[in-house]
């Protein structure tokens, strides 16, 4: 994120050479605090804002922050909000899921009718699938990936299914990291009755494949690709926002407004493409975000 922000600054200064930037890149966790305490003008986040961050801002300022979407999460670039999704063993015939089914598979619900526990409940037939339990693979419940899935697919619930095998990064003695997403797909490779949450960057060398995903029960279904992420068709698309402090009925600070308009311009979005990590947003989406700054 730091390199992208620096390139945005340099690009903006070509049009506004007198502008001066001061920034502290301590990470997403500190950005909102700097905004609502008046230490910063713009909080550019590396992930979607958390509800507790909105609440903290509201407690201090008595109104919510204004969000401007700047970029789209990556397909498979580590640490750049890559697209999450469900995976199965390559020997499993299941091809697709809806978000509602994903919720019913991974989340626990009080009503038994809202829990999907076996493969026949997902439409698989035959003695090798009927009545066979779905084995779940995912991150620890406190992981930021789990937290985001709770918001995006589980209606904010924190109640994961009991028995899910949970993973965290493993730090090896040589300094390398065995990513949790890789561990999930490695273990799923040996379990034809398993379903896991991960990312396509970890597919190579495993006996697994991703499922198509739909927002609605009857589709349309999508894989996570650059096109489907930029177009917001893939249901678990990640969004990279900037948050600003704009009091109700008041204009955006002129300097903040001009900088954000630059980020949403063709030149600003092209910097995202050149950076090669995050993805840009659609021109139509950029136009909608610019409207928020009026």
Annotate each predicted stretch with a short phrase.
Residues 1-294:
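Flexible loop/hinge segments at secondary-structure junctions
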């Amino acid at each position: 994120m730091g390199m992208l922000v620096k390139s945005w600054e340099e690009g903006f200064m070509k049009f506004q050479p007198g502008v001066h930037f001061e920034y502290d890149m301590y990470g997403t966790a500190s950005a909102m605090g700097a905004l609502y305490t008046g230490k910063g003008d713009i909080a550019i986040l590396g992930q979607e804002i958390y509800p507790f961050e909105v609440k903290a801002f509201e407690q201090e300022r008595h109104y919510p922050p204004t969000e401007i979407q700047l970029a789209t999460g990556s397909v498979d670039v580590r640490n750049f909000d890559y697209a999450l999704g469900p995976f199965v063993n390559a020997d499993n015939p299941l091809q697709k899921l809806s978000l509602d089914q994903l919720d019913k598979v991974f989340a626990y619900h009080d009503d038994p009718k809202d829990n999907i526990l076996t493969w026949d409940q997902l439409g698989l037939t035959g003695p090798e699938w009927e009545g066979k339990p779905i084995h779940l693979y995912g991150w620890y419940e406190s992981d930021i990936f789990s937290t985001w899935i709770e918001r995006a697919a589980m209606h904010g619930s924190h109640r994961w299914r009991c028995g899910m095998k949970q993973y965290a990064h493993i730090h090896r003695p040589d300094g390398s990291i065995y990513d949790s997403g890789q561990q999930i797909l490695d273990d799923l490779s040996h379990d034809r009755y398993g379903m896991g949450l991960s990312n396509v960057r970890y597919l190579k060398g495993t006996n697994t494949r991703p499922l198509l995903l739909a927002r609605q029960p009857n589709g349309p279904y999508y894989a996570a690709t650059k096109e489907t992420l930029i177009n917001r068709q893939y249901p678990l698309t990640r969004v990279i926002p900037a948050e600003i402090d704009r009091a109700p009925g008041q204009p955006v600070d002129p300097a903040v407004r001009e900088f954000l308009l630059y980020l949403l311009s063709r030149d600003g979005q092209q910097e995202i493409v050149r950076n090669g990590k995050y993805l840009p947003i659609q021109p139509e989406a950029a136009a909608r975000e610019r409207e928020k700054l009026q």
